[in-house]
Amino acid sequence: MNKINIGDILDFTTEKSARKAIFKEGRLDTGLLLYAPGQTTPDHKHSDIDEVFYVISGEGTITINNEEMRLKEKDIIFSPHGETHGFNNTSSANWVVLQIKIRD
């Protein structure tokens, strides 16, 4: 069993959004997506990965198959493999999203 304090791995000093790995075991891969205001991840898709995104703090938008949706603290969303998705922190605060990847 491993324990990590999320506060210990938050880092918003990079120019681009960042992913901080948490745990990786077998088909499961978890990490934090960190977005300072204005930072984005371009639309992309995975052919063999389902993903769950849970907003820990802040708010922003996720675009799924060209449909934009606002996400805020405590929102959770599932993105199955093959679905196009991207992120944009449109707020004035940092945005922290827990990402859970499940490989086929």
Segments predicted by a language model, with ranges:
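Well-ordered beta-strand scaffold positions
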Residues: 26-28, 59, 67-69
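Short beta-strand segments in beta-sandwich/barrel cores
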Residues: 40-41, 58-64
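Conserved short histidine dyad/triad with adjacent acidic residue
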Residues: 31-46
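Ligand-binding loop in jelly-roll beta-barrel domains
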Residues: 81-104
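Glycine- and acidic-residue-biased ligand/ion/polar-headgroup-sensing regions
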Residues: 48-50, 55-60
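Short acidic-glycine-tyrosine-enriched beta hairpin
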Residues: 67-81
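A short, N-terminal "cap"/entry segment at the start of jelly-roll beta-barrel domains
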Residues: 1-28
